[in-house]
UniProtKB/Swiss-Prot annotation:
Keywords: Host membrane, Late protein, Membrane, Transmembrane, Transmembrane helix, Virion. The chain crosses the membrane at residues 7-27. It is a single-pass membrane protein. It is found in: Host membrane; Virion. Coiled coil: none annotated. The keyword Transcription does not apply. This is Uncharacterized protein E146L. Induction: Expressed in the late phase of the viral replicative cycle. One of its GO terms (cellular component) is membrane. Belongs to the asfivirus E146L family. It comes from African swine fever virus (isolate Warthog/Namibia/Wart80/1980) (ASFV).
């Protein structure tokens, strides 16, 4: 009976160590920073032509100014991760995706929506939209392939 308990204990210790190593590997290695500014086409591409469905994002912040000069920030990590995961069931998943899809719109203050600030209810007319033309926008974060 003592031999079985020792075996179970040693297997448990090995599994805990492997889980700790996997946690450290995922959270502290392989993340590369990215930054896009207003006017850039935002494209995420895998380095080895693997499926974009395996790309993950962390600490992704979309920052923009409004026409009054106020600074706004949104955490868009979940949005980008869900965009990448959306390719998981594709028949021939691509190795890249562009924000805005086939339109390939450059990064601007409307790339992501903050309700009550840059949504359709707030920016109603063409004149309202024209005021946003010179507003700055940036997208920063970390990306990696899992």
């Amino acid at each position: 009976m003592g031999g079985t308990a020792d075996f179970v204990l040693s297997i448990t210790i090995v599994l805990v160590i492997l889980i700790i190593i996997a946690f450290i590997w995922y959270n502290f290695t392989g993340w590369s920073p990215f930054k896009y500014s207003k006017g850039n086409i935002v494209t995420f591409k895998t380095p080895d032509e693997s499926s974009i469905a395996y790309m993950r994002f962390r600490n992704c912040i979309f920052t923009f100014t409004d026409p009054k000069g106020s600074l706004h920030s949104i955490d868009v990590t979940e949005v980008l991760n869900n965009m990448a995961k959306g390719f998981r069931d594709a028949q021939n998943p691509p190795s890249s995706f562009t924000l805005g899809g086939h339109c390939q719109a450059p990064l601007n203050a409307f790339s992501f929506v903050l309700p009550g600030v840059n949504d359709r209810a707030t920016v109603v007319t063409a004149d309202d939209a024209k005021k946003w033309e010179n507003c700055d926008a940036t997208l920063t974060g970390l990306q990696r392939i899992i």
